UniProtKB/Swiss-Prot annotation:
Binding site residues for Mg(2+) 1: D194, D198
One cellular component term from this protein's GO annotations in UniProt: plasma membrane
Protein name: K(+)-insensitive pyrophosphate-energized proton pump
Binding site residues for substrate: K191, K679
The species this protein was found in: Pyrobaculum aerophilum (strain ATCC 51768 / DSM 7523 / JCM 9630 / CIP 104966 / NBRC 100827 / IM2)
Length: 721
């Protein structure tokens, strides 16, 4: 097969995946939605989620149009790329929106169907419905990403034979930008609604979780979908697009044989084939422990992907050493996915020591719960970082000795190693379909439990949905670790791509050889260069600013929701006596309005700061900013996500021991409340932040380098070195 054939294969499989996702969606929606009350609850959740998403998309549309025009004028017109960079940016953004909407459309309508399946078909049927609802999201994500990458690659190679790589990366920039706002806005919504509903409902009014008398209960369930489904899907979709396009970009700019570009697209296509199989490998008959069935489906998918990588590598026409090296580095990335999931599980599941240690501290006070949980979160970052470092080192060495980079003098071997790390990153991301299937299953089962509670179904039905929900909490927590690790590797690959695009742009503008430009550029990137250090501190500061703004936004929004729920209880005392209907829509509207208002400032900071830094301080200050954001952002995201997950499950561990409404339980609830915005707002929002910084910089590199040269600050930056 030639290069065009592999890209066509990607297009065909991408379309096939979308069709299969639609088939699964139709199957799920044909299931019995239950009685009238169950349908009402499910419809209320779906309506609230759709209203939020559409209002968010309308808000984003203005920013996307402004940036598309800027890219057209500043990038496409000077480089004569026929507007394709702007087009890729818009399509990448629309793809992210579509992936989020498709998955959320099905998951919000699945809750009553899972609840009814639990009532009539037991554990097995309920598990199947919730799993297939999650698979709609997983398959949509992977298929749309593969379709866009393969399709745009075909178009760009045909229209722009010599300058097609940067427009392809713009696909990732569009996806990154939408994801950033979806993660921030969705995270603020979901945790503010959760906090508001719990603080007034459970703590003040003393009513159970998901009680229909709570005016915030629908907003809480809507938040599960806009944050945990649409947000997570957009996050991993973006990482997929960014990593694969950056790897293709590197292969092109390093002048590698076309088989290496073919390998990237081929491996992504083969992983999607494995995902088709994995989605159908879930055992549901006679199952008592759903987590084991889900884990088996994930392991089988990744194992099949690895086998297909090695088989596919030998169809590329490379010698056996290079084929094996490509398959090995990609497989290395794929096999660490379950390892990262397992590490996260160890630190966030109540089956292991760290969470039980937090639960034990609840016997003393909320303060010791928070202190111990924070310590667990700090420690949890270490093994994940160790795995990332090991993968980078091993894949670098494989690439160093096998990838045929030439024409860069003494740097050729070093650059070959860099491509090896890019392939490992590709391996981690192309198995995203099955990981997101497991993640999206979580909110579906969570909402199903809420429907059972609100509809007043029998206790035995609630027991089934509680088991499914417990497994869903585990899959949601562990997927956060995967998303953060994948974001880290994607950001590192993009960072290398950025440096080479800077060199390439300077070479074109100044008319110098690329080898000379590499040597000249690296002199401006030394760690003792003041510009680099200034940029690094700015990157760290951006991470902390971003974390602060999102945390405070949750608090402000939750405060308004709390006041509204209190007002309804005060003005309508019949609500608590089952005599009056709560105004669910009012709370949904508050959460929507405040979340959309709060996400603009941190989002705009992620766009404006790198552009100003690169244009005025110099390209090396921009490089320092990005590296500072990566080094500060990845451990902080792991801390936030895992500490929050550990606090959550410490509370659940106390509950399963029958210790609800004790002082010990109250202490654990406080820890869980503190951890909620950390694990579902701040931590997840840092993933797209570090990728937006990279993709934005790659797309605007030509403008940044041109400005640096015009201002006389190339290559050393504003401060002389």
């Amino acid at each position: 097969m030639n290069m065009i054939s592999y890209a066509l294969l990607g297009v065909i499989l991408g379309i096939s995946g979308v069709i299969y996702a639609v088939y699964l969606a139709v199957w799920v929606l044909r299931q019995d939605p239950g009685n009238e009350k169950m349908r009402f609850i499910s419809q209320a959740i779906a309506t609230g989620a759709r209203a939020y998403l559409f209002r968010q998309y309308r808000t984003l549309a203005v920013l996307l149009v402004i940036l598309a025009v800027l890219i057209l004028v500043a990038i496409d017109m000077p480089r004569r790329t026929f507007g394709l960079t702007a087009l890729a940016f818009i399509v990448g953004a629309l793809g992210s929106m579509l992936a989020g909407y498709l998955g959320m459309y099905v998951t919000t309508r699945s809750a009553s169907r899972v609840a009814q399946a639990a009532a009539t078909g037991g554990m097995g049927k309920a598990l199947l419905v919730s799993w297939r609802a999650g698979a709609v999201m997983g398959l949509s994500l992977a298929s749309i990403a593969l379709l866009l990458i393969s399709g745009f690659y075909l178009v760009f190679r045909s229209v722009l034979p010599d300058d097609w790589a940067v427009p392809l990366v713009a696909l990732g920039f569009g996806a990154s930008l939408v994801t950033l706002f979806m993660r921030v806005g969705g995270g603020i919504y979901t945790k503010a609604a959760d906090l508001g509903a719990d603080l007034v409902g459970k703590v003040e009014a003393g009513i159970p979780e998901d009680d229909p008398r709570n005016p915030g209960v629908i907003a809480d369930n809507v938040g599960d979908n806009v944050g945990d489904v649409a947000g997570m899907a957009a996050d991993v979709y973006e990482s997929y697009i960014v990593t694969v396009t950056a790897a293709i970009f590197l292969a092109a700019i390093l002048g590698l044989p076309t088989q290496f570009i073919e390998a990237i697209i081929l491996f992504a296509a083969l992983a999607l084939v494995a995902t088709f199989a994995g989605v159908n490998l879930l055992k549901t008959t006679g199952v008592k422990h759903p987590l084991s069935s889900i884990s088996l489906a994930i392991y089988a998918t990744i194992g099949l992907s690895v086998v297909l990588f090695f088989i596919g590598a030998f169809t590329l026409g490379l010698d056996s050493t290079k084929a094996l090296a490509l398959a090995a580095t990609t497989s290395l990335g794929a096999v660490i996915a379950p390892l990262i999931v397992k590490i996260t599980d160890y630190y966030t599941s109540y089956n292991y020591g760290p969470v039980r240690k937090i639960a034990e501290q609840a016997k003393i006070s909320p303060a010791t719960v928070i202190i111990t949980g924070y310590g667990v979160g700090l420690m949890s970052a270490i093994p994940v970082i160790a795995v990332i470092v090991a993968v980078l080192g091993i894949s670098y060495m494989i690439g160093y000795y096998t990838v045929p980079v030439s024409g860069f003098g003494e740097l050729s071997k070093y650059l070959a190693g860099i491509f090896g790390t890019a392939m490992a990153s590709v391996g981690l991301l192309v198995v995203a379909g099955i990981i997101i299937t497991a993640d999206s299953y979580g909110p579906v089962s969570d909402n199903a439990g809420g429907v059972v509670e609100m509809a007043g179904l029998p206790d035995e039905v609630r027991e089934i949905t509680d088991v499914l929900d417990s497994v869903g909490n585990t899959t949601k927590a562990t997927t956060k670790g995967y998303a953060i690790a994948s974001a880290a590797l994607a950001a590192l690959v993009l960072f290398i791509a950025l440096i080479f695009e800077i060199v390439y742009s300077a070479s074109k503008i100044l008319g110098k050889g690329i080898v000379d430009m590499i040597s000249e550029s690296l002199s401006g990137l030394q760690l003792i260069n003041a510009n680099v250090l200034i940029g690094a501190f700015l990157g760290v500061a951006l991470v902390y600013f971003f974390s602060s703004r999102t945390l405070e936004a949750v608090g402000r929004t939750a405060m308004e929701i709390v006041e509204e729920i209190r007002r309804q209880f005060r003005e309508k005392p019949g609500i608590l006596e089952w005599k009056e209907q709560p105004d669910y829509a009012r709370v949904v509207d508050i959460a929507t309005r405040r979340a959309l208002g709060e996400f603009l400032i941190p989002g705009l900071a992620a766009i404006v700061l790198p552009l100003i830094t690169g244009l005025l301080l110099g390209w090396n200050a921009l490089a320092g900013l990005i590296m500072g954001a990566i080094v500060a952002g990845v451990p902080r995201a792991l801390l936030m996500a895992n500490a929050g997950g550990a606090w959550d499950n410490a509370k659940k561990y106390i509950e399963i021991q029958g210790l609800k409404k004790t002082e010990m339980h109250k202490a654990a609830v406080i820890g869980d409340t503190v951890g909620d915005p950390m694990k579902d707002t701040v931590g997840p929002s840092l993933n797209p932040l570090i990728k937006v910084l990279n993709t934005l910089s790659v797309v605007f590199t030509y403008v940044i380098v041109s400005t640096n040269i015009a201002l006389g600050i190339w290559p050393s930056g504003l401060l002389p070195f």
